[in-house]
Amino acid sequence: TGTKNGGLVLVGGEISEIAEITTDDVLTIVKEALNKTIKTSFEDFDLDNLSIYNELTPQSEEIRAAVEDDEDQGAGDQGIMVGFATNKTKSFMPPTFDISRNIQKSLWDLQNSDEMLDLDSKVQVTSGGEKTKVVVSTQHNKAIDMEKLFHEVSEIVSNNVESEFELDLNPSGSFVKGGPAGDTGLTGRKIVVDAYGPSVPVGGGAFSGKDPSKVDRSAAYAARHLAKNIVAHKLADDCLVRVSYAIGKAEPYELT
């Protein structure tokens, strides 16, 4: 997040005692991640003047004892996970979600190649009316030619939307200050975007920052794999798989 003193990054969580992750390791990982995702420093988030805190702690002994087993590893927490697939797209993902992801991928390429663009952006696609509505917000330099940018983004959208569309580019107007300087970031805040979009229910757990013992991640991936194979083998047009677990138990409580 941005601060008055140049920015702050807090790395927290619980890890296995055998991981042997040092503070130097954390600093290296953080700096590498930031350099991949941020081009421009701001007064309140300066890549060369950050305060980086390592607050990783050992995992609870109660959780470790419940999860670790020589034969069957137990689930790292309780939870409900959802996997989904549809034959409406080649990726087996919901159509508007698939379109938005493809637009975002092309936009990412443009951002990395154009010195007038920074790397903060998001895409929203909705359909159901006469036109497909596409909202794109992308961070830029103050001196950018917005007419040129609109043309470039319109071309990206037209390559991914087959029907007639309406593009709303940077509806807030100027978007110069972005990334952690513009918004406080936190892992797990966008679980619907990380999954399938709003047309498919989510179990509630985030994917990021978790090892495979955390079924929020591993069981969600397994449920998606099962749903995708059911649709790919033409056993259904759409498939939603739901699975639930209790902490410490190797077998799911429910699979539907």
Predicted regions and their residues:
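Alpha-helical support elements that line or immediately flank enzyme active sites
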Residues: T1, A85-L107, K210-K234
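A structural-propensity feature for long, helix-poor, extended segments
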Residues: V9, D114-G129, H233-T256
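Beta-strand segments within the central parallel beta-sheet cores of soluble alpha/beta enzyme folds
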Residues: G2-T3, L50-N54, E166-N170, A236-Y245, ...
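Glycine-rich, mobile lid/loop segments that gate access to catalytic sites or pores
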Residues: G6-G7, E17, T28, E32-G178
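Glycine-rich anion/phosphate-binding loop at the beta-strand->alpha-helix junction
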Residues: I144-I230
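Short, charge-patterned binding micro-sites
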Residues: G2-I18, I247-E251
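Short glycine/threonine-rich loop-to-helix capping motif typified by GTGT followed
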Residues: A19-I21, S174-G188, S244-T256
